[in-house]
Amino acid sequence: MLQPKRMKFRKMHKGRNRGYAAGDSVSFGTFGLKSVGRGRMTARQIEAARRAMTRAVKRQGKIWIRVFPDKPITEKPLEVRQGKGKGNVEYWVCQIQPGRVLYEMEGVPESVAREAFELAASKLPFKTTFVTRTVM
């Protein structure tokens, strides 16, 4: 699963997920899966969606993952009283704003790409849409 190799500090504040996304255009592939809603995407969700897409395209074409989980989420163990410091890092997330391109794909027909992205979108906790590359 994806996570940073090393960080300056192990734990982070919760923060807020406001604003609109950078990385809002398809820049590597021909087709993309773009977020419409906002939320947090865990490393497990990124991997589950990637596997669903890879199986749908039968390992043809090329897939790019445009997001990386760089925020640690901590949890305290069950039945532990409050206090005594912040909990341990349990998993990693990336914060997603509306307009962020999550995955890109090329080398497959549009119908296959749409189907693959639909399977991937079902694994994610927010709404997404299918986009194509615009040539200027």
UniProtKB/Swiss-Prot annotation:
Keywords: Ribonucleoprotein, Ribosomal protein, RNA-binding, rRNA-binding, tRNA-binding. This is Large ribosomal subunit protein uL16. One of its GO terms (biological process) is translation. One of its GO terms (cellular component) is cytosolic large ribosomal subunit. Part of the 50S ribosomal subunit. NCBIfam families: rplP_bact (TIGR01164). Belongs to the universal ribosomal protein uL16 family.
